[in-house]
Amino acid sequence: MRLLLASNSPRRRELLNLSQWSFQVVMGEVNEHPLPSERSSEYVLRLAQEKTKSGAAHGNVGDLVIAADTAVVDRENGAELILGKPQDALEARSMLYWLRGRVHRVYSGVAVLRIGDINPLSDVCITDVPMRNYSDEEIEAYVATGDPLDKAGAYAIQHPVFKPVERLQGCYANVMGLPLCHLTRLMMQMGETPPTDITAACQQALGYHCPVYAKILSGVRLYK
């Protein structure tokens, strides 16, 4: 049995490496346009599921395919607004101004498919993200690094200088793009026990004391 990660995200590779599972990276190309009236949770879950099926083309029967999709979501006039990757520095700057000093949500769908099965196991992780009141000068300096341009919402929670988030109370790895406790739970349902304590490895690597991992691993849903 091989483990395949259907993703070209370096952050997802970095996070999955913490598990000490041996895996191979494959492409999981899908159409990422939301469907009409599709909720954010439905959107990321659908894309994660579709990515596993796309990635399955690179494996053999019995192999496991992991995939995830993450969306930064804000609300405007009561409607969900998905913030993708900025097209340029101007849009990155605009997103950072918009998010400053406010709380938005990050949704990640994660799915695991055993090749040969019809459908993957899947779940959604949701994290409330409180952005700090960073200055205009900090925005300009961060945008000048180019880092926001390949990030949904135009920021990386783990950036060592900008540090855009404060007082996070949810899953940090989710905001980076791969909620490891949700993945662990799905893998164990597949009969695959991680070779290491993923929760400890995640917290140590990210420098974050996670207050929710035990509830997630036990199957508690933190958001309705």
Predicted regions and their residues:
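Short glycine-rich, Thr/Ser-proximal phosphate-binding strand/loop in the N-terminal lobe
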Residues: Q20-S37, P120-D123
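Anionic-ligand binding patches
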Residues: L3-L4, S40-K224
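N-terminal beta1-alpha1 ligand-phosphate binding loop
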Residues: M1-W21
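Short loop/helix-cap segments at secondary-structure boundaries that form the rim of catalytic
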Residues: E14-L18, L35, A57-H58
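Short glycine/proline-enriched coil/turn segments at helix->beta-strand junctions
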Residues: S19-S22, N60-G62
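Cofactor-binding loop segments of dinucleotide-utilizing enzymes, especially the Rossmann-like FAD-
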Residues: N8, G28, I115
